[in-house]
């Protein structure tokens, strides 16, 4: 019981500290006139909140594991809240299994999903009035996978991978933290990113 209380307390404190940092970034965002600065601070704030929401779930559970579906749902809701575009109606659907993962995997997946959703919402649906994003989770015996796909305009993967911070973060987390593989395919019919862990 003491271990459970300690785990809850640690995750609760981490969540509160991260939310304080996000609040400071929000204040900073309000003080700038630069749209580019506002966008960069907003992206950073969303990254921090994705980690904070995972720690909130971990604090509620009292163990160092959490249901992956809950993590993804939180990230989806946060991302839609901060990156909604009144000129473009985007739906995000989730499919597949739900299973427990430890805190390290949960945090890495939260950041990865956040980055992939941000990229789709920022770039995929430019000059469009609607779009769809699908998140598919597959639990395997040795490896599990997550696929995030959109029906947007696509992009040149070969000439973009090193130029976008979000994709660099995704590549690093999949390789170094999850010890998995990342595949990105993109064309005029949309983009699909798939990673395993």
State the predicted function of each range:
Residues 25-39, 62:
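Short acidic helix/loop segment immediately C-terminal to the autophosphorylated histidine
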């Amino acid at each position: 019981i003491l271990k459970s209380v300690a785990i809850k307390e640690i995750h609760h404190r981490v969540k509160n500290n991260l939310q304080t940092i996000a609040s400071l970034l929000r204040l900073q965002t309000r003080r700038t006139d630069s749209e580019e600065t506002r966008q960069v601070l907003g992206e950073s704030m969303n990254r921090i909140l994705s980690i904070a929401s995972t720690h909130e779930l971990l604090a509620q559970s009292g163990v160092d594991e959490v249901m992956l579906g809950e993590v993804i749902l939180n990230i989806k809701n946060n991302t839609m809240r901060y990156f909604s575009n009144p000129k473009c109606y985007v739906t995000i659907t989730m499919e597949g299994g739900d299973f427990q993962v430890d805190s390290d995997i949960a945090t890495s997946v939260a950041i990865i999903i956040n980055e992939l959703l941000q990229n789709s919402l920022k770039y995929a649906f430019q000059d469009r009035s609607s779009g769809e994003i699908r998140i598919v989770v597959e639990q395997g015996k040795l490896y599990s996978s997550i696929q995030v796909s959109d029906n947007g305009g696509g992009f040149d993967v070969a000439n973009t991978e090193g130029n976008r911070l979000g994709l660099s973060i995704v590549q690093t987390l999949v390789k170094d933290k999850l010890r998995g593989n990342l595949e990105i395919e993109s064309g005029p019919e949309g983009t699909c990113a798939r990673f395993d862990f």
